[in-house]
Every structure is written in structure tokens, then in C-alpha cells.
Swiss-Prot record:
The protein, known as: Cinnamyl alcohol dehydrogenase 2
Pathway this chain belongs to: Aromatic compound metabolism; phenylpropanoid biosynthesis
Chemical reaction(s) catalysed: (E)-cinnamyl alcohol + NADP(+) = (E)-cinnamaldehyde + NADPH + H(+); (E)-coniferol + NADP(+) = (E)-coniferaldehyde + NADPH + H(+); (E)-sinapyl alcohol + NADP(+) = (E)-sinapaldehyde + NADPH + H(+); (E)-4-coumaroyl alcohol + NADP(+) = (E)-4-coumaraldehyde + NADPH + H(+)
Function: Involved in lignin biosynthesis. Catalyzes the final step specific for the production of lignin monomers. Catalyzes the NADPH-dependent reduction of coniferaldehyde and sinapaldehyde to their respective alcohols. Plays the major role in monolignol biosynthesis. Functions cooperatively with COMT in the culm internodes for the biosynthesis of monolignols, the lignin precursors. May be involved in lignin biosynthesis in leaves and roots.
A Pfam family annotated for this UniProt entry: ADH_zinc_N
Keyword terms of this UniProt record: Lignin biosynthesis, Metal-binding, NADP, Oxidoreductase, Zinc
Residues that bind NADP(+): 49, 167, 188-193, 211-216, 251, 275, 298-300
Cofactor(s) demanded: Zn(2+)
Gene Ontology molecular function, alphabetical: cinnamyl-alcohol dehydrogenase activity; coniferyl-alcohol dehydrogenase activity; zinc ion binding
Quaternary data: Homodimer.
Protein encoded by which gene: CAD2
Sites where the protein binds Zn(2+) 1: 47, 69-70, 163
Lineage of source species: Eukaryota, Viridiplantae, Streptophyta, Embryophyta, Tracheophyta
């Protein structure tokens, strides 16, 4: 892609305002630093958070914004101090691309909880430039925030694991919920939820999918291998399932009550929140007190856990269920994702979309 010292012009697909509609956008990458890796983007998954950010649902969006944080690409250049990667490596980039490296979370190697973390897009890098994500032809990323995609994992399959797969793996590991025989619940059967079923089943758990309707019963049990299916609006079934689960992975990204799901937990059970919601959630305290239950949360995972989950999926033969689309379909894909019309993750074939040839309107 040229000299390391030179800035590189690339094309991404950017939101220009809170409509969230993406169009081609030309911009320059920062100069490659000593520990930077230049990645030619091959594939990028589409996460529900991309909708939140593109449409300013969280109130902090800055435009133009190139979304995408489930990035798989090929290393094309490396800085002189890069030791982990070389040209030709297939690598992944996830939700964050920077941290302070000095705080307690950073020193404990859980850098995703650093208060000075730098998001892969809709943020400002240390040089003052806006960060832009993986709906683009290339990225420049510090080697600390790059992982190698292991052999045996197709790049388009790897993309959702960098967010959706990692997001369910990390809390199960952290909270000691990896032992065979546990009974887990997965609330919501989208991109994260379907990986929750697959990961938990591969750990030997009895898995119950919890959904608001019976519509996904067949795919949950027949396609994904869930052991049980619970319709949350069925009061009798919910009552019969009370005190039966060791944990629930709550992936729902919209406001919803917590009390019906707290009632499903055993003594010391955990309700693990993963959906990004910008409204307060509520519950009455006896729902947790009278079972020593915990409402907790988890945010993606560390770089070490990212490597772990990729290798875990290779070892267990796990793949994400995806629909691959070209970049010129990305707006339709976002619309379909918003109405839950995907099984279960869109992945954009960036390299196959020839986006550098697109005509970009003025910024």
C-alpha cells in the first residue's frame, strides 16, 4: 500500500447523520506507527451496536462515521517494532483499538474495562484523528489490538466471533460457568444469542432458549441444538421453569423487564446483561435477595480471551451462522437487522465489493 511514512487514502461506507444511512466516504488513514499493523479488510460483521451508533441512539455519535467492529483482514504492512505479525497474516480487529496501559484493568489484562479505552470507530485516537471502523478497505491498528485468525477458521466465519462469540465466552469463563452439567438460559436469539447457544452447548450445558414468541422454537432446538425453549409470555411455562437455571445470558438490546427472568434462576444464579440499552432497567429487591441472585454485566472480552475463543471454536468445530452480503447491500442489511430479519449475523464481503472504486460524495 505504499510507504509506511505516507498517509493512505481509503474508502469506507459512512453514516453522515442520525438517519444512519451509509454512503461511500473517502478519508486518510494515519501514518503507520512503530507498532502499527496495516490491515486490508476482507470481511466485517454487522452488530446491533452499529445501528445504535449510526443512528445516534446513545447520544454520542460523531459524523461522518464508518461503522464495523468485527473485522477480519490481511496484514499488508507492519511498523518496524511489530513482532507478532507479518505481511500475509490473516488477522482480526474487534471493538477496541486502544487503552491507557496504566490502570488496574489494563495491568490485569482486561483492557476492555479501561476508562480510557479507544473504540474502533466513533472515537478519537491518540493523534487526535477520528477512528473509523471496518466497513472500509483498510485500517491501521496497534498490534496489541490485533489477533491472528487460526487455521481452520474461514475469515467470514471468524468475523462475528470477534464480538458476538467473545461476548458470550468471556462471562462464562470469568464467572466460573464452564463446567459440564450446568443449566443455562439464553434470552434473545440474535447474533449474540445464537453464539450463546452454541458455546454453552459445546461446554456441556443444558441450554434453554427464552424468547417472546414460539416463532423461533424450531430453529433454536433443531438447528442450534438447544435442549428446551421457553416462551416468556406463557405464564404457566415460566412458572414451571422457576428456580431451574444456573445463569441466563441476556442479549436483548431493547428495554425489557428483568423480574420474569430472575424468577427462573436457582439459588446463586446469575443474570448476565449484554444488550446495550439506553433506558433504566428495574426490579424489586426481594427478587435477588430471596435467592442470593446476582444481576451482573459483561462487556466483550480481553485480547487474551479473543485468542482463546477463536481457538475454542476451532477445537469444538463451532461456526457462526451468517449471511454474507456485499457493501452495496449494507443499508438493507442494517434495516433487516433492526427488524430481526437475519439468521443470525450479516457479514460484509468488503474485499469482494471493490469499494475503492465507489464514487464518494463530499464529506
Amino acid at each position: 500500500m505504499g510507504s509506511l511514512a505516507a498517509e493512505k487514502t481509503v474508502t469506507g461506507w459512512a453514516a453522515r447523520d442520525a438517519s444512519g444511512h451509509l454512503t461511500p466516504y473517502n478519508y486518510t488513514l494515519r501514518k503507520t506507527g512503530p507498532e502499527d499493523v496495516v490491515v486490508k479488510v476482507l470481511y466485517c460483521g454487522i452488530c446491533h451496536t452499529d445501528i445504535h451508533q449510526a443512528k445516534n441512539h446513545l447520544g454520542a455519535s460523531k459524523y461522518p462515521m464508518v461503522p464495523g467492529h468485527e473485522v477480519v483482514g490481511e496484514v499488508v504492512e507492519v511498523g518496524p517494532e511489530v513482532t507478532k505479525y507479518s505481511a500475509g497474516d490473516v488477522v482480526g480487529v474487534g471493538v477496541i483499538v486502544g487503552c491507557c496501559r496504566e490502570c488496574h484493568p489494563c495491568k490485569a489484562n482486561v483492557e476492555q474495562y479501561c476508562n480510557k479505552r479507544i473504540w474502533s470507530y466513533n472515537d478519537v485516537y491518540t493523534d487526535g484523528r477520528p477512528t473509523q471502523g471496518g466497513f472500509a478497505s483498510a485500517m491501521v491498528v496497534d498490534q496489541k489490538f490485533v489477533v491472528k485468525i487460526p487455521a481452520g477458521l474461514a475469515p467470514e466465519q471468524a468475523a462475528p466471533l470477534l464480538c458476538a462469540g467473545l461476548t458470550v465466552y468471556s462471562p462464562l469463563k470469568h464467572f466460573g460457568l464452564m463446567s459440564p452439567g450446568l443449566r443455562g438460559g439464553v434470552l434473545g436469539l440474535g447474533g449474540v444469542g445464537h453464539m450463546g447457544v452454541k458455546v454453552a452447548k459445546s461446554m456441556g450445558h443444558h441450554v434453554t432458549v427464552i424468547s417472546s414468541s414460539a416463532r423461533k422454537r424450531g430453529e433454536a432446538m433443531d438447528d442450534l441444538g438447544a435442549d428446551a425453549y421457553l416462551v416468556s409470555s406463557d405464564a404457566a411455562a415460566m412458572a414451571a421453569a422457576g428456580d431451574s437455571l444456573d445463569y441466563i445470558i441476556d442479549t436483548v438490546p431493547v428495554h425489557h423487564p428483568l423480574e420474569p427472568y430472575l424468577a427462573l434462576l436457582k439459588l446463586d444464579g446469575k443474570l448476565i446483561l449484554m444488550g446495550v440499552i439506553n433506558q433504566p432497567l428495574s426490579f424489586i429487591s426481594p427478587m435477588v435477595m430471596l435467592g442470593r441472585k446476582a444481576i451482573t454485566g459483561s462487556f466483550i472480552g480481553s485480547m487474551a480471551e479473543t485468542e482463546e475463543v477463536l481457538n475454542f471454536c476451532v477445537d469444538k468445530g463451532l461456526t457462526s451462522q451468517i449471511e454474507v452480503v456485499k457493501m452495496d447491500y449494507v443499508n438493507q442489511a442494517l434495516e433487516r437487522l433492526e427488524r430481526n430479519d437475519v439468521r443470525y449475523r450479516f457479514v460484509v464481503d468488503v474485499a469482494g465489493s471493490n469499494i475503492d472504486d465507489a464514487d464518494a460524495p463530499p464529506a
